[in-house]
């Protein structure tokens, strides 16, 4: 199955690239595909495979928290080089043999070409074993989202206490050493009966004219739904209680159970937003879906 799409561009290459994960019953590996039109994707190959046995990323590697040149919502998703390398934070798991076997970790990867990735640090950047790990995240750390703003790096990540997931924030001055924000979680769960009652996860943050917007997924009301939150300071967020897109929105049934884990791109050719997401149907089949802000041919 496939999951966790993230679309980006690399200087000197035409078109777009997308990383995603493939699950082979043992764990996650990250793959990359190419597209000229944001609809048809081909040239699939491995981007980053399993880490060494006994280490924090042996059971799974989930690329997608890239260092971009610009985080404006309409900017090209162009990767930014730092000292000759592109960088991505990544989610990881230490054990093979199943789906997201806890506890999860986060690492940092680097690449010279944006296609093939390797570890940039041999220890995790976030772990449940670190001294500043909070109660809300004590059981598992999941997927990061990297943002650079005014010389600082922000990592919006989801984590779990039991079966409850929320979004927290870690900060860094160099990409390699991170400290958690003292008032985590920054996007907590909603009240009973809300669309994010159980999960507020997988935040993707962009600048939109005069404020920041986070696209995340909530779990509640018998499904996973694409939701949004807003802030001006990156710390204090206001959640829109009504989903942007609800599970079951596609009449084919491909997202009848979950619609989550988005990647957003503005296509100037047709002046439309393209939002990729992980679609899960009623029997658990996973794949990558696409919704757009305007009809496309």
Q: What is each model feature region?
A:
Residues 1-11, 39-79, 115-148, 176-207, ...:
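Surface loop/turn signatures of beta-propeller and other carbohydrate-active proteins
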Residues 28-31, 107-109, 130-133, 165-168, ...:
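Phosphate-binding glycine-rich loops and adjacent basic patches that engage nucleotide phosphates
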Residues 25-28, 56:
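Short active-site-adjacent helix-start/loop capping segments
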Residues 215-226, 230-241:
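Glycine/small-residue-rich hydrophobic helix-like segments
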Residues 3-24, 32, 44-47, 63-101, ...:
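Hydrophobic core segments of beta-strands in well-ordered, beta-rich domains
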Residues 31-38, 104-114, 168-174, 227-234, ...:
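Beta-propeller blade signature
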């Amino acid at each position: 199955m496939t999951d966790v799409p993230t679309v980006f561009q690399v200087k000197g290459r035409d078109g777009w690239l997308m990383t995603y994960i493939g699950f082979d019953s043992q764990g996650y590996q990250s793959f990359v595909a190419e597209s000229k039109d944001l609809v048809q994707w081909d040239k699939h190959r491995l981007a980053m495979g399993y880490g060494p046995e006994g280490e924090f990323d042996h059971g799974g590697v989930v690329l997608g928290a890239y260092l971009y040149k610009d985080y404006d919502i309409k900017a090209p998703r162009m990767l930014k080089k730092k000292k000759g390398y592109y960088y991505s934070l990544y989610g990881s798991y230490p054990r093979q043999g199943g789906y997201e076997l806890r506890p999860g970790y986060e690492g940092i990867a680097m690449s010279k070409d944006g296609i093939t990735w390797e570890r940039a640090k041999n220890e995790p950047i976030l772990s449940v074993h670190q001294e500043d790990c909070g109660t809300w995240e004590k059981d598992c750390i999941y997927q990061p989202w990297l943002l650079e703003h005014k010389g600082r790096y922000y990592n919006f990540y989801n984590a779990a206490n039991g079966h409850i997931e929320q979004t927290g924030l870690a900060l860094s001055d160099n990409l390699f050493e991170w400290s958690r924000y003292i008032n985590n979680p920054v996007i907590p769960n909603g009240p009973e009966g809300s669309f994010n009652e159980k999960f507020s996860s997988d935040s993707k943050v962009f600048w939109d004219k005069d404020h920041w917007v986070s696209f995340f997924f909530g779990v509640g009301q018998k499904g996973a739904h694409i939701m949004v939150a807003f802030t001006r300071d990156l710390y204090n967020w206001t959640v829109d209680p009504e989903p942007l897109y609800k599970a079951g929105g596609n009449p084919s049934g491909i997202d009848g159970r979950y619609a989550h884990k988005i990647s957003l791109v503005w296509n100037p050719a047709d002046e439309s937003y393209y939002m990729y997401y992980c679609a899960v149907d009623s029997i658990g089949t996973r794949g990558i879906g696409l919704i757009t802000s305007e009809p496309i041919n």
